[in-house]
Amino acid sequence: MSSLQSTELFQQQAYINGQWLAAQSNATVPVSNPATGEEIGTITNMGAAEATQAVEAAYTALQSWKALTAQNRADILLAWHKLVLDHTDELALIMTIEQGKPLAEAKGEVRYAASFIQWFAEEGKRIYGDVIPTVNNQQRFIISKEPVGVVAAITPWNFPIAMITRKAAPALAAGCTVVIKPANETPYCALAIAKLAEKAGIPAGVINVVTGKSQEIGSVFTSHEKVKKLTFTGSTPVGRLLMQQCSSTIKKLALELGGNAPLIVFDDADLDKAVQGAIFAKFRNAGQTCVCANRIYVHDNIYQAFAEKFVQEVQKFKVGNGLEDGVQIGPLINEKAVLKAQQLIDDAVSKGAKIACGGKQHALGQTFYEPSVLTNVDRTMEIVQEEIFGPVAPLIRFTDEADVVVQANDTIFGLAAYVYSENISRLWRVSEQLEYGMVGMNATAISNEVVPFGGVKQSGVGREGSKYGLEEFMTIKYMCLGL
Protein backbone atom coordinates (compact mmCIF):
# COMPACT_ATOMS: atom_id res chain seq x y z
CA MET A 1 0.00 0.00 0.00
CA SER A 2 3.05 2.23 -0.02
CA SER A 3 2.05 3.51 -3.49
CA LEU A 4 -0.97 5.33 -2.08
CA GLN A 5 -0.69 9.07 -2.58
CA SER A 6 -2.46 9.73 0.70
CA THR A 7 -1.29 7.16 3.23
CA GLU A 8 -3.73 8.45 5.83
CA LEU A 9 -6.51 6.70 3.91
CA PHE A 10 -4.98 3.33 4.74
CA GLN A 11 -6.35 2.72 8.22
CA GLN A 12 -6.02 -0.54 10.16
CA GLN A 13 -7.98 0.47 13.27
CA ALA A 14 -11.74 0.80 13.67
CA TYR A 15 -13.52 4.15 13.85
CA ILE A 16 -15.80 4.66 16.85
CA ASN A 17 -17.10 7.98 18.17
CA GLY A 18 -14.55 9.96 16.19
CA GLN A 19 -11.57 7.93 17.41
CA TRP A 20 -9.37 5.34 15.70
CA LEU A 21 -9.29 2.39 18.07
CA ALA A 22 -7.81 -1.08 18.43
CA ALA A 23 -9.82 -3.98 19.83
CA GLN A 24 -9.85 -4.17 23.61
CA SER A 25 -8.00 -7.48 23.27
CA ASN A 26 -5.49 -5.95 20.81
CA ALA A 27 -6.25 -8.91 18.54
CA THR A 28 -5.91 -8.50 14.78
CA VAL A 29 -6.72 -10.53 11.68
CA PRO A 30 -4.87 -10.43 8.34
CA VAL A 31 -6.27 -9.12 5.07
CA SER A 32 -5.01 -10.61 1.81
CA ASN A 33 -4.81 -9.54 -1.82
CA PRO A 34 -6.94 -12.05 -3.78
CA ALA A 35 -4.76 -11.62 -6.88
CA THR A 36 -1.48 -12.54 -5.18
CA GLY A 37 -2.40 -14.17 -1.89
CA GLU A 38 -0.04 -11.77 -0.15
CA GLU A 39 -0.98 -10.16 3.14
CA ILE A 40 -1.84 -6.48 2.74
CA GLY A 41 -2.03 -5.71 6.43
CA THR A 42 -4.23 -6.42 9.41
CA ILE A 43 -7.44 -5.08 10.90
CA THR A 44 -8.40 -4.87 14.52
CA ASN A 45 -10.53 -7.86 15.53
CA MET A 46 -13.40 -6.37 17.51
CA GLY A 47 -16.41 -8.12 19.00
CA ALA A 48 -19.57 -7.53 21.01
CA ALA A 49 -18.11 -5.02 23.48
CA GLU A 50 -16.83 -2.67 20.81
CA ALA A 51 -19.99 -3.04 18.71
CA THR A 52 -22.03 -2.02 21.75
CA GLN A 53 -19.72 0.94 22.29
CA ALA A 54 -20.29 2.03 18.68
CA VAL A 55 -24.07 1.74 18.98
CA GLU A 56 -24.06 3.83 22.15
CA ALA A 57 -21.88 6.45 20.45
CA ALA A 58 -24.27 6.57 17.50
CA TYR A 59 -27.23 6.95 19.83
CA THR A 60 -25.59 9.85 21.68
CA ALA A 61 -24.68 11.58 18.40
CA LEU A 62 -28.19 11.07 17.03
CA GLN A 63 -29.73 13.82 19.16
CA SER A 64 -27.59 16.63 17.78
CA TRP A 65 -27.32 15.27 14.22
CA LYS A 66 -31.06 15.02 13.67
CA ALA A 67 -31.49 18.51 15.17
CA LEU A 68 -29.50 20.05 12.31
CA THR A 69 -31.42 21.49 9.41
CA ALA A 70 -31.54 19.48 6.21
CA GLN A 71 -29.36 22.15 4.60
CA ASN A 72 -26.75 21.85 7.36
CA ARG A 73 -26.56 18.09 6.84
CA ALA A 74 -26.46 18.54 3.06
CA ASP A 75 -23.49 20.91 3.30
CA ILE A 76 -21.52 18.36 5.31
CA LEU A 77 -22.47 15.49 3.01
CA LEU A 78 -21.47 17.49 -0.06
CA ALA A 79 -18.07 18.12 1.51
CA TRP A 80 -17.76 14.34 1.95
CA HIS A 81 -18.82 13.84 -1.67
CA LYS A 82 -16.10 16.19 -2.90
CA LEU A 83 -13.42 14.46 -0.85
CA VAL A 84 -14.44 11.05 -2.19
CA LEU A 85 -14.14 12.28 -5.77
CA ASP A 86 -10.87 14.07 -5.02
CA HIS A 87 -9.44 10.77 -3.73
CA THR A 88 -10.79 8.56 -6.51
CA ASP A 89 -7.39 7.19 -7.48
CA GLU A 90 -6.36 6.30 -3.92
CA LEU A 91 -9.71 4.71 -3.09
CA ALA A 92 -9.67 2.70 -6.33
CA LEU A 93 -6.16 1.48 -5.58
CA ILE A 94 -7.20 0.27 -2.14
CA MET A 95 -10.22 -1.44 -3.68
CA THR A 96 -8.29 -3.25 -6.38
CA ILE A 97 -5.64 -4.45 -3.95
CA GLU A 98 -8.09 -5.87 -1.40
CA GLN A 99 -11.01 -6.86 -3.66
CA GLY A 100 -9.34 -7.65 -6.98
CA LYS A 101 -11.49 -5.86 -9.56
CA PRO A 102 -9.67 -4.07 -12.40
CA LEU A 103 -8.55 -0.55 -11.56
CA ALA A 104 -10.83 1.00 -14.19
CA GLU A 105 -13.84 -0.75 -12.64
CA ALA A 106 -12.73 0.34 -9.18
CA LYS A 107 -12.57 3.97 -10.29
CA GLY A 108 -16.04 3.60 -11.76
CA GLU A 109 -17.30 2.26 -8.45
CA VAL A 110 -15.85 5.23 -6.56
CA ARG A 111 -17.71 7.63 -8.84
CA TYR A 112 -20.87 5.52 -8.50
CA ALA A 113 -20.47 5.56 -4.71
CA ALA A 114 -20.01 9.33 -4.67
CA SER A 115 -23.20 9.82 -6.69
CA PHE A 116 -25.28 8.47 -3.79
CA ILE A 117 -23.76 10.97 -1.38
CA GLN A 118 -24.55 13.88 -3.69
CA TRP A 119 -28.06 12.65 -4.54
CA PHE A 120 -29.13 12.10 -0.95
CA ALA A 121 -27.52 15.32 0.27
CA GLU A 122 -29.86 17.17 -2.07
CA GLU A 123 -32.85 14.85 -1.65
CA GLY A 124 -32.70 15.25 2.13
CA LYS A 125 -33.91 18.83 1.64
CA ARG A 126 -37.09 17.49 0.04
CA ILE A 127 -38.48 15.40 2.89
CA TYR A 128 -42.09 16.52 2.98
CA GLY A 129 -44.87 15.92 5.46
CA ASP A 130 -48.58 16.24 4.81
CA VAL A 131 -51.80 17.86 5.98
CA ILE A 132 -54.88 15.64 5.83
CA PRO A 133 -58.33 17.25 5.35
CA THR A 134 -60.21 16.99 8.59
CA VAL A 135 -63.33 14.94 9.22
CA ASN A 136 -64.01 17.02 12.33
CA ASN A 137 -64.00 20.84 12.42
CA GLN A 138 -62.56 20.72 15.93
CA GLN A 139 -59.39 18.88 14.86
CA ARG A 140 -56.50 19.21 12.42
CA PHE A 141 -54.40 16.27 11.12
CA ILE A 142 -50.69 16.71 10.41
CA ILE A 143 -48.14 14.14 9.19
CA SER A 144 -44.39 14.51 9.71
CA LYS A 145 -41.46 12.30 8.77
CA GLU A 146 -38.70 11.67 11.28
CA PRO A 147 -35.38 9.80 11.22
CA VAL A 148 -35.79 6.20 12.29
CA GLY A 149 -32.79 6.44 14.65
CA VAL A 150 -29.55 4.47 14.89
CA VAL A 151 -28.92 2.37 11.77
CA ALA A 152 -26.70 -0.72 11.67
CA ALA A 153 -25.30 -1.55 8.24
CA ILE A 154 -23.61 -4.79 7.21
CA THR A 155 -21.90 -4.44 3.84
CA PRO A 156 -20.43 -6.93 1.33
CA TRP A 157 -17.04 -7.36 -0.31
CA ASN A 158 -18.09 -7.17 -3.98
CA PHE A 159 -18.83 -3.41 -3.99
CA PRO A 160 -16.98 -2.35 -0.83
CA ILE A 161 -17.44 1.42 -1.20
CA ALA A 162 -20.69 1.83 -3.12
CA MET A 163 -22.64 -0.43 -0.79
CA ILE A 164 -21.55 1.74 2.13
CA THR A 165 -22.52 5.08 0.61
CA ARG A 166 -25.79 3.66 -0.74
CA LYS A 167 -26.76 2.92 2.86
CA ALA A 168 -24.98 5.61 4.86
CA ALA A 169 -25.78 8.62 2.67
CA PRO A 170 -29.59 8.33 2.86
CA ALA A 171 -29.39 7.46 6.54
CA LEU A 172 -27.36 10.58 7.30
CA ALA A 173 -29.48 12.77 5.02
CA ALA A 174 -32.59 11.63 6.88
CA GLY A 175 -31.01 12.53 10.24
CA CYS A 176 -29.98 9.03 11.34
CA THR A 177 -26.59 7.91 12.63
CA VAL A 178 -24.82 4.78 11.41
CA VAL A 179 -22.68 1.87 12.61
CA ILE A 180 -21.08 -0.06 9.75
CA LYS A 181 -19.69 -3.59 9.77
CA PRO A 182 -17.77 -4.12 6.51
CA ALA A 183 -16.85 -7.51 5.11
CA ASN A 184 -13.58 -8.81 6.54
CA GLU A 185 -12.29 -9.34 3.00
CA THR A 186 -12.52 -5.61 2.20
CA PRO A 187 -12.30 -3.52 5.38
CA TYR A 188 -9.82 -0.92 4.13
CA CYS A 189 -12.33 0.61 1.70
CA ALA A 190 -14.77 1.18 4.56
CA LEU A 191 -12.12 2.66 6.81
CA ALA A 192 -10.87 4.95 4.03
CA ILE A 193 -14.41 6.21 3.45
CA ALA A 194 -14.74 6.82 7.20
CA LYS A 195 -11.48 8.77 7.18
CA LEU A 196 -12.86 11.03 4.46
CA ALA A 197 -16.11 11.43 6.39
CA GLU A 198 -14.06 12.57 9.38
CA LYS A 199 -12.15 15.06 7.21
CA ALA A 200 -15.44 16.35 5.78
CA GLY A 201 -16.60 17.35 9.24
CA ILE A 202 -19.15 14.63 9.92
CA PRO A 203 -19.36 14.77 13.73
CA ALA A 204 -18.03 12.09 16.06
CA GLY A 205 -20.44 9.20 16.48
CA VAL A 206 -22.48 9.94 13.37
CA ILE A 207 -20.51 7.37 11.34
CA ASN A 208 -18.81 4.43 13.03
CA VAL A 209 -16.98 1.47 11.47
CA VAL A 210 -16.47 -1.71 13.50
CA THR A 211 -14.24 -4.46 12.07
CA GLY A 212 -13.72 -8.01 13.26
CA LYS A 213 -15.95 -10.84 14.47
CA SER A 214 -18.95 -10.91 12.16
CA GLN A 215 -21.23 -13.06 14.30
CA GLU A 216 -20.57 -11.19 17.54
CA ILE A 217 -20.98 -7.78 15.94
CA GLY A 218 -24.05 -8.90 14.01
CA SER A 219 -25.66 -10.22 17.19
CA VAL A 220 -25.28 -6.81 18.83
CA PHE A 221 -26.81 -5.13 15.79
CA THR A 222 -29.85 -7.40 15.81
CA SER A 223 -30.47 -7.44 19.57
CA HIS A 224 -29.60 -3.92 20.74
CA GLU A 225 -32.71 -1.91 21.58
CA LYS A 226 -31.15 1.34 20.39
CA VAL A 227 -30.59 0.03 16.86
CA LYS A 228 -33.84 0.89 15.09
CA LYS A 229 -32.96 -0.29 11.60
CA LEU A 230 -30.71 -2.99 10.14
CA THR A 231 -29.65 -2.79 6.50
CA PHE A 232 -27.77 -5.71 4.98
CA THR A 233 -26.41 -6.67 1.58
CA GLY A 234 -25.31 -10.28 1.26
CA SER A 235 -26.49 -13.83 0.87
CA THR A 236 -30.08 -14.99 1.31
CA PRO A 237 -29.24 -17.53 4.07
CA VAL A 238 -27.55 -14.84 6.16
CA GLY A 239 -30.42 -12.45 5.44
CA ARG A 240 -32.91 -14.99 6.73
CA LEU A 241 -30.88 -15.39 9.92
CA LEU A 242 -30.64 -11.64 10.50
CA MET A 243 -34.37 -11.21 9.94
CA GLN A 244 -35.05 -13.91 12.50
CA GLN A 245 -32.65 -12.38 15.03
CA CYS A 246 -34.20 -8.92 14.62
CA SER A 247 -37.63 -10.22 15.57
CA SER A 248 -36.89 -9.91 19.29
CA THR A 249 -36.58 -6.12 18.99
CA ILE A 250 -38.90 -5.50 15.99
CA LYS A 251 -36.48 -3.47 13.88
CA LYS A 252 -37.04 -1.90 10.51
CA LEU A 253 -35.23 -4.04 7.93
CA ALA A 254 -33.70 -3.60 4.49
CA LEU A 255 -32.28 -6.76 2.94
CA GLU A 256 -30.59 -6.84 -0.47
CA LEU A 257 -29.92 -10.54 -0.95
CA GLY A 258 -29.05 -13.09 -3.61
CA GLY A 259 -30.10 -13.09 -7.23
CA ASN A 260 -30.50 -15.52 -10.10
CA ALA A 261 -31.07 -13.06 -12.92
CA PRO A 262 -32.46 -14.30 -16.23
CA LEU A 263 -31.51 -12.55 -19.45
CA ILE A 264 -33.95 -13.37 -22.26
CA VAL A 265 -33.01 -12.79 -25.91
CA PHE A 266 -35.90 -13.09 -28.36
CA ASP A 267 -35.36 -13.79 -32.05
CA ASP A 268 -36.43 -10.25 -32.95
CA ALA A 269 -33.70 -8.70 -30.78
CA ASP A 270 -30.82 -6.61 -32.10
CA LEU A 271 -28.25 -9.40 -31.88
CA ASP A 272 -25.17 -7.23 -31.45
CA LYS A 273 -26.79 -5.12 -28.72
CA ALA A 274 -27.98 -8.26 -26.96
CA VAL A 275 -24.51 -9.79 -27.04
CA GLN A 276 -22.87 -6.65 -25.66
CA GLY A 277 -25.55 -6.28 -23.01
CA ALA A 278 -25.11 -9.88 -21.93
CA ILE A 279 -21.33 -9.48 -21.78
CA PHE A 280 -21.69 -6.53 -19.42
CA ALA A 281 -24.40 -8.16 -17.33
CA LYS A 282 -22.45 -11.38 -16.91
CA PHE A 283 -18.78 -10.49 -16.58
CA ARG A 284 -18.63 -7.19 -14.70
CA ASN A 285 -16.61 -7.68 -11.50
CA ALA A 286 -15.71 -11.18 -12.76
CA GLY A 287 -19.35 -12.17 -12.44
CA GLN A 288 -19.43 -11.35 -8.74
CA THR A 289 -22.53 -9.17 -8.59
CA CYS A 290 -26.03 -9.95 -7.36
CA VAL A 291 -27.57 -8.65 -10.59
CA CYS A 292 -25.33 -10.66 -12.92
CA ALA A 293 -27.04 -12.46 -15.78
CA ASN A 294 -27.05 -15.90 -14.21
CA ARG A 295 -29.19 -17.63 -16.85
CA ILE A 296 -29.07 -16.50 -20.48
CA TYR A 297 -32.13 -17.70 -22.42
CA VAL A 298 -31.74 -17.42 -26.21
CA HIS A 299 -34.46 -18.18 -28.76
CA ASP A 300 -33.80 -21.28 -30.83
CA ASN A 301 -33.88 -19.33 -34.11
CA ILE A 302 -30.83 -17.25 -33.14
CA TYR A 303 -29.20 -19.52 -30.55
CA GLN A 304 -26.25 -20.55 -32.70
CA ALA A 305 -25.56 -17.06 -34.02
CA PHE A 306 -25.77 -15.56 -30.54
CA ALA A 307 -23.52 -18.24 -29.05
CA GLU A 308 -20.84 -17.70 -31.70
CA LYS A 309 -20.75 -13.93 -31.26
CA PHE A 310 -20.91 -14.22 -27.47
CA VAL A 311 -18.03 -16.71 -27.29
CA GLN A 312 -15.92 -14.54 -29.59
CA GLU A 313 -16.33 -11.60 -27.21
CA VAL A 314 -15.63 -13.69 -24.10
CA GLN A 315 -12.41 -15.03 -25.60
CA LYS A 316 -11.13 -11.45 -25.98
CA PHE A 317 -11.08 -10.83 -22.22
CA LYS A 318 -7.72 -10.14 -20.63
CA VAL A 319 -7.49 -11.87 -17.25
CA GLY A 320 -5.01 -10.84 -14.59
CA ASN A 321 -4.11 -8.68 -11.62
CA GLY A 322 -6.44 -5.70 -11.60
CA LEU A 323 -3.48 -3.33 -11.31
CA GLU A 324 -2.14 -4.36 -14.73
CA ASP A 325 -3.02 -2.26 -17.77
CA GLY A 326 -5.83 -3.61 -19.90
CA VAL A 327 -7.03 -6.27 -17.48
CA GLN A 328 -10.80 -6.77 -17.73
CA ILE A 329 -11.32 -9.80 -15.49
CA GLY A 330 -9.62 -9.92 -12.11
CA PRO A 331 -9.45 -12.72 -9.56
CA LEU A 332 -12.36 -14.21 -7.70
CA ILE A 333 -12.48 -13.22 -4.05
CA ASN A 334 -11.05 -16.51 -2.75
CA GLU A 335 -10.31 -20.12 -3.68
CA LYS A 336 -13.72 -21.23 -2.40
CA ALA A 337 -15.31 -19.16 -5.18
CA VAL A 338 -13.09 -20.88 -7.76
CA LEU A 339 -14.11 -24.28 -6.42
CA LYS A 340 -17.80 -23.35 -6.63
CA ALA A 341 -17.47 -22.29 -10.27
CA GLN A 342 -15.74 -25.55 -11.12
CA GLN A 343 -18.32 -27.65 -9.31
CA LEU A 344 -21.19 -25.96 -11.15
CA ILE A 345 -19.51 -26.51 -14.50
CA ASP A 346 -18.67 -30.14 -13.71
CA ASP A 347 -22.28 -30.81 -12.72
CA ALA A 348 -23.60 -29.20 -15.91
CA VAL A 349 -21.20 -31.13 -18.15
CA SER A 350 -22.11 -34.39 -16.44
CA LYS A 351 -25.74 -33.70 -17.39
CA GLY A 352 -25.08 -32.86 -21.03
CA ALA A 353 -23.83 -29.27 -21.21
CA LYS A 354 -20.96 -28.40 -23.56
CA ILE A 355 -18.04 -26.11 -22.78
CA ALA A 356 -17.81 -23.51 -25.56
CA CYS A 357 -14.83 -21.78 -23.94
CA GLY A 358 -13.07 -21.73 -20.59
CA GLY A 359 -14.30 -24.27 -18.11
CA LYS A 360 -11.31 -24.44 -15.81
CA GLN A 361 -9.02 -22.54 -13.48
CA HIS A 362 -6.92 -19.97 -15.33
CA ALA A 363 -3.24 -20.63 -16.00
CA LEU A 364 -2.48 -17.84 -13.51
CA GLY A 365 -3.74 -20.23 -10.84
CA GLN A 366 -4.85 -19.32 -7.33
CA THR A 367 -8.10 -17.35 -7.52
CA PHE A 368 -8.19 -16.80 -11.28
CA TYR A 369 -10.81 -18.57 -13.38
CA GLU A 370 -11.21 -18.60 -17.13
CA PRO A 371 -14.20 -16.66 -18.49
CA SER A 372 -16.45 -19.52 -19.49
CA VAL A 373 -19.48 -20.21 -21.67
CA LEU A 374 -21.63 -23.33 -21.51
CA THR A 375 -24.11 -24.37 -24.20
CA ASN A 376 -26.88 -27.00 -24.17
CA VAL A 377 -27.76 -26.02 -20.61
CA ASP A 378 -31.14 -27.00 -19.18
CA ARG A 379 -33.13 -26.51 -15.99
CA THR A 380 -31.99 -29.81 -14.43
CA MET A 381 -28.50 -28.44 -13.85
CA GLU A 382 -27.37 -26.79 -10.62
CA ILE A 383 -25.95 -23.83 -12.53
CA VAL A 384 -29.52 -22.83 -13.49
CA GLN A 385 -30.77 -23.08 -9.92
CA GLU A 386 -27.93 -21.45 -7.97
CA GLU A 387 -26.34 -18.02 -7.98
CA ILE A 388 -23.01 -18.53 -9.77
CA PHE A 389 -21.03 -15.49 -8.58
CA GLY A 390 -18.26 -16.15 -11.07
CA PRO A 391 -17.34 -15.64 -14.76
CA VAL A 392 -19.44 -18.50 -16.10
CA ALA A 393 -22.28 -17.93 -18.60
CA PRO A 394 -24.82 -20.71 -19.26
CA LEU A 395 -26.76 -20.41 -22.53
CA ILE A 396 -30.23 -21.97 -22.49
CA ARG A 397 -32.33 -22.57 -25.59
CA PHE A 398 -36.06 -21.68 -25.70
CA THR A 399 -38.81 -21.59 -28.33
CA ASP A 400 -41.93 -20.24 -26.61
CA GLU A 401 -42.52 -16.87 -24.95
CA ALA A 402 -44.89 -18.14 -22.29
CA ASP A 403 -42.57 -21.02 -21.40
CA VAL A 404 -39.46 -18.86 -21.07
CA VAL A 405 -41.31 -16.55 -18.68
CA VAL A 406 -42.23 -19.58 -16.56
CA GLN A 407 -38.59 -20.73 -16.60
CA ALA A 408 -37.32 -17.26 -15.73
CA ASN A 409 -39.68 -17.06 -12.75
CA ASP A 410 -38.87 -20.58 -11.56
CA THR A 411 -36.56 -19.50 -8.74
CA ILE A 412 -36.79 -18.35 -5.14
CA PHE A 413 -34.97 -15.17 -6.16
CA GLY A 414 -36.42 -12.00 -7.66
CA LEU A 415 -33.81 -9.26 -7.88
CA ALA A 416 -33.07 -8.36 -11.53
CA ALA A 417 -34.07 -9.62 -14.97
CA TYR A 418 -33.26 -8.53 -18.52
CA VAL A 419 -35.15 -8.80 -21.82
CA TYR A 420 -33.97 -8.10 -25.37
CA SER A 421 -36.49 -7.61 -28.19
CA GLU A 422 -37.24 -4.99 -30.84
CA ASN A 423 -40.97 -5.54 -30.28
CA ILE A 424 -42.08 -2.93 -27.77
CA SER A 425 -45.31 -4.77 -27.01
CA ARG A 426 -43.37 -7.93 -26.18
CA LEU A 427 -40.94 -5.99 -23.99
CA TRP A 428 -43.76 -4.60 -21.87
CA ARG A 429 -45.75 -7.83 -21.85
CA VAL A 430 -42.84 -9.99 -20.71
CA SER A 431 -41.43 -7.42 -18.28
CA GLU A 432 -44.77 -7.13 -16.51
CA GLN A 433 -44.90 -10.92 -16.08
CA LEU A 434 -41.38 -11.26 -14.69
CA GLU A 435 -41.39 -11.61 -10.90
CA TYR A 436 -38.43 -9.32 -10.23
CA GLY A 437 -37.87 -6.00 -8.51
CA MET A 438 -35.96 -4.60 -11.49
CA VAL A 439 -36.21 -5.34 -15.21
CA GLY A 440 -33.86 -4.05 -17.89
CA MET A 441 -35.52 -3.81 -21.31
CA ASN A 442 -32.80 -3.71 -24.00
CA ALA A 443 -30.50 -2.51 -21.21
CA THR A 444 -28.30 -4.13 -18.58
CA ALA A 445 -26.61 -1.11 -16.95
CA ILE A 446 -29.69 -0.38 -14.87
CA SER A 447 -28.40 0.77 -11.48
CA ASN A 448 -27.82 4.41 -10.53
CA GLU A 449 -28.53 6.78 -7.68
CA VAL A 450 -31.92 8.06 -8.89
CA VAL A 451 -33.72 4.71 -9.26
CA PRO A 452 -34.89 2.23 -6.59
CA PHE A 453 -32.66 -0.84 -6.31
CA GLY A 454 -34.10 -3.96 -4.69
CA GLY A 455 -35.87 -7.25 -5.16
CA VAL A 456 -38.87 -9.39 -4.34
CA LYS A 457 -39.30 -12.97 -3.11
CA GLN A 458 -36.15 -14.17 -1.32
CA SER A 459 -33.99 -11.48 -2.89
CA GLY A 460 -34.95 -9.19 -0.05
CA VAL A 461 -37.10 -6.32 1.17
CA GLY A 462 -36.73 -2.57 0.90
CA ARG A 463 -35.17 -0.30 -1.72
CA GLU A 464 -31.89 1.60 -2.02
CA GLY A 465 -31.30 4.71 -4.11
CA SER A 466 -33.95 7.17 -5.33
CA LYS A 467 -36.52 9.01 -3.22
CA TYR A 468 -37.79 5.63 -2.04
CA GLY A 469 -34.37 4.83 -0.60
CA LEU A 470 -34.57 7.94 1.56
CA GLU A 471 -38.00 6.97 2.89
CA GLU A 472 -36.50 3.69 4.13
CA PHE A 473 -34.71 5.64 6.87
CA MET A 474 -37.72 7.57 8.14
CA THR A 475 -40.82 6.92 10.18
CA ILE A 476 -44.19 8.60 9.82
CA LYS A 477 -45.68 10.48 12.75
CA TYR A 478 -49.33 11.51 12.79
CA MET A 479 -50.27 14.47 15.02
CA CYS A 480 -53.82 15.47 15.84
CA LEU A 481 -54.46 19.04 17.01
CA GLY A 482 -57.65 19.78 18.92
CA LEU A 483 -59.01 23.32 18.53
Give the location of each predicted region:
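Residue-level signal for inorganic ion chemistry
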Residues: 37, 73, 95, 117, ...
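Rossmann-like NAD(P) dinucleotide-binding subdomain of oxidoreductase/dehydrogenase enzymes
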Residues: 129-273, 398
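Hydrophobic face of amphipathic alpha-helices that form TPR/SEL1-like repeat modules
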Residues: 1-35
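ALDH superfamily catalytic-core signature
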Residues: 237-378, 441
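Glycine-rich loop-to-alpha-helix module at the N-terminal edge of alpha/beta enzyme cores
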Residues: 38-127, 138
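Short, well-ordered beta-strand elements within core beta-sheets of diverse protein domains
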Residues: 39-46, 61-67, 153, 263-266, ...
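Conserved C-terminal structural/oligomerization subdomain of aldehyde/semialdehyde dehydrogenase
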Residues: 36-42, 227, 264, 318-319, ...
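Structural signal for hydrophobic packing residues in well-ordered secondary-structure cores
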Residues: 62, 66, 81-88, 92, ...
